[in-house]
Regions:
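Short alpha-helical segments and helix-capping/turn motifs at coil-helix boundaries
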Residues: 20-24, 93, 147-148
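Alpha/beta-hydrolase-fold enzymes
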Residues: 105, 111-189
Length: 219
């Protein structure tokens, strides 16, 4: 089972680059040998989410809820044991939770760009800044805004911050090697933010509040 990152979806793991590097013949996750399950997390892709209509009346969920939902999905399709759980960023953190919550259900865990510890420090500061950017936007209206709000001021802060949070310094330097390209990149990121729903984005980042697998990993 492969788990996507924060504010992403299963579609992120179905891009051509993954087929070339991971899913092709003789590659680590060769599709002719393995059955891959790539679910949309709660609040992402085609899964249920606030923007379906409930707005902030949608139940708040955490990473543990997402892991339980993933396990229920496996039960529904008749999969009793996994060869591998692999995830990146948010998916990596959920991978650690799989190890804590359902340690007998898989042979191997691969948690990428994540650590088995509660979110704190710089990572938590970024998340709080993203949440505050959304909650302080007048157009957010406590989460009860029209489908197409007149403005999305929150994306000017939240989307570039999200890119800094999830991208490496080396990657961002390659994308923006000069002053001009850095400014252009910020503009591009803001433009891409128009595709996001404020409540969906807020819920996704705040869902990490229950994440702390460390105490249970030694069991």
């Amino acid at each position: 089972m492969l788990l996507h990152g924060t504010a992403g979806s299963a579609a992120d793991l179905a891009q051509a680059a993954f087929f070339e590097a991971l899913y092709g013949a003789e590659e680590p996750l060769d599709l002719s040998r393995y059955f891959l399950v790539i679910p949309d997390a709660i609040g992402a892709g085609d899964s249920s989410k606030p923007s379906d209509g409930l707005h902030t009346h949608f139940p708040h969920y955490g990473y543990k809820d997402q892991v339980r939902a993933q396990r229920l999905l496996l039960e529904r399709v008749g999969i009793k044991h996994l060869k591998l759980v692999l995830g990146t960023t948010m998916g990596g953190m959920q991978t650690w939770l799989w190890g804590e919550m359902f340690s007998n259900d898989m042979d191997c865990l691969v948690a990428i760009a994540s650590t088995p510890a509660a979110i704190s420090g710089r990572n938590m500061m970024w998340r709080e800044m993203i949440s505050q950017a959304i909650r302080s936007d007048p157009a957010w209206k406590n989460g009860d805004y029209p489908k197409d709000p007149p403005s999305k001021n929150w994306i000017k802060t939240a989307i570039p911050l999200s890119a800094i949070m999830t991208g490496s310094a080396e990657q961002l330097q390659k994308q923006a090697p000069s002053r001009e390209t850095a400014i252009d990149l910020v503009d591009e990121l803001e433009a891409s933010g128009e595709a996001y729903d404020a409540n969906d984005f807020l819920y996704a980042f705040e869902s990490s509040a229950d994440y702390d697998p460390a105490p249970g990993l030694s069991r």
